[in-house]
Amino acid sequence: MKTIITKNLILIALVAFVFNVQATEKNEMQNAMNLTPNIEEGKKTYELCATCHNADGWGKTDGSFPVIAGQHRSVIIKQLADIRARNRENPTMYPFTGDDVIGGAQGLEDVAEYISQLPANPSPGKGNGLHLEEGKKLFNEKCMACHGSEGMGNAEAFFPKIQGQHYEYLLRQLQWIRDGRRKNANPAMLALIKEMDDKTLAIIADYVSRIPAAK
């Protein structure tokens, strides 16, 4: 009887902990969104980010580090908050997202605003280009409703800009979302791609990587 009670108490404690982490993350994100950014402070913080994402925010064409330049401020804030709340698995980023590095909500706002104003990458890494018509069809059917016809996303809905992103990074994230490795993935997106094989995801990623920049 005592064992059952103990297990139940542990379970309750774990559930309470998870909800507390999620609430903290949400509060931090909302607080950051309501602050006035300090671009100069954001630029200083970004010097550390540039180690991997480069000074221009264009990452690496092999997809090991994504393009972040020009991404919506809201999306950047959410992803950073998710990563440091461990709601998105990214061990490489963990050391760079702590309060001691970025700061609190104000730090998130500052660096996110700075990154959002960097010019977008005009030439991201691309796939083989063999199935672009099929990729366009799939994109229009599965992706356009949220990400827009030009892949520009929706800042208010936290839908990321995907135009100008590296093919290899896009493909990896699609696979991770499908396979349940992205804990912070949008459930609606998971439902759309959960039955897709790697080839289909690659075709979509290749098309997206080639969407021309909006004029």
Language model features by range: what are they?
Residues 9-18:
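Bacterial N-terminal signal peptides
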Residues 23-46, 59-64, 113-138:
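Electrostatic cytochrome c docking/interface patches
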Residues 1-10:
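Bacterial N-terminal signal peptides that target proteins for export
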Residues 61-67, 83-110, 115-118, 123-127, ...:
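Axial heme c-ligation environment in periplasmic c-type cytochrome domains
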Residues 42, 49-55, 111, 142-149, ...:
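The canonical Cys-X-X-Cys-His
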Residues 32, 39, 58-88, 94-99, ...:
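Gly/Gly-Pro-rich "capping" loops immediately C-terminal to redox-active cysteine motifs
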Residues 37, 44, 55, 140, ...:
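His/Met- and acidic-residue-enriched segments that coordinate or traffic transition-metal cofactors
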